[in-house]
Amino acid sequence: MTPPLGDIAHVGHAQLFTPDLDASVAFFTDYLGLTVNGQDGDTVYLRTYDDYEHHSLVLTARERPGLGRLALRTSSEEALQRRVAALEAAGRSGKWVEDEPGIGRLYLTADPDGHEHALYWESEHYQAPDELRPALKNQPQARPNRGVGVRRLDHVNFLAADVLANAEFQEQLLGARPTEQIRLDSGKIAARWLTFTDKSYDVVYTEDWTGSSGRLHHIAFAADTREDILRAADLAIDTGVFIETGPHKHAIQQ
């Protein structure tokens, strides 16, 4: 049975593992313009300026880089319970934890590829300190005066050994809708873009050519304009940030 639309309200935050925590924090604050909003041991919580929640990104020190969890906020407590019931009825294992500041209990599970997902409802609204208080009341935080100044976390692109199985997990158990895909001449689905909202996409699965499971392709942050993207490229060149590809856009959804 297809889940009701709207049980997943939006992408909440993502967690990345890093072998150099200080350098990673510097990249996200100095270059992208995120703000540190707390630290607990080897874990740092950062936020984009237009996020109403406590954090948008979690950086945790680990020996090897990688993806931790993707957190998805539900539209209500009832929606959270519906998704948990659907996951358990489908045989997906999970557990409840309460281990993040500003967030209530989270239900941890994983897609078929092993990417950890956290579903939650309870969330504290961010209250900016005086030095970050915005002039506009409907803006959670003043726009940063450094770096790119990205507005919000936009989407996560997972690498997957089996794109179709993982995409169907999102569709059948979490309520995502496909908006774009790459189908090879053989009929195999090599990539699929999915959304929980009215955006083009929130979650993407791309075939991992190595056949590995549980890896990350990229996370993406939203800027306001095309000019912001070009400015980000200029800042990358000026500050020594490596540009792997682009700027470019998708052929279909752009």
Q: What does each of the following model-derived ranges do?
A:
Residues M1-P4, A85-G149, R192-W193, G240-Q254:
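Vicinal oxygen chelate
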Residues G6, Q15-E53, F158-Y201, D234:
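Core segments of cupin and vicinal oxygen chelate
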Residues M1-A89, S93, V97-L108:
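An N-terminus-focused feature that recognizes amino-terminal "leader" regions
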Residues K199-G214:
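Flexible internal linker/loop segments at domain or repeat junctions
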Residues T210, L216-Q254:
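Active-site/pore-lining binding-face segments in mid-to-C-terminal subdomains
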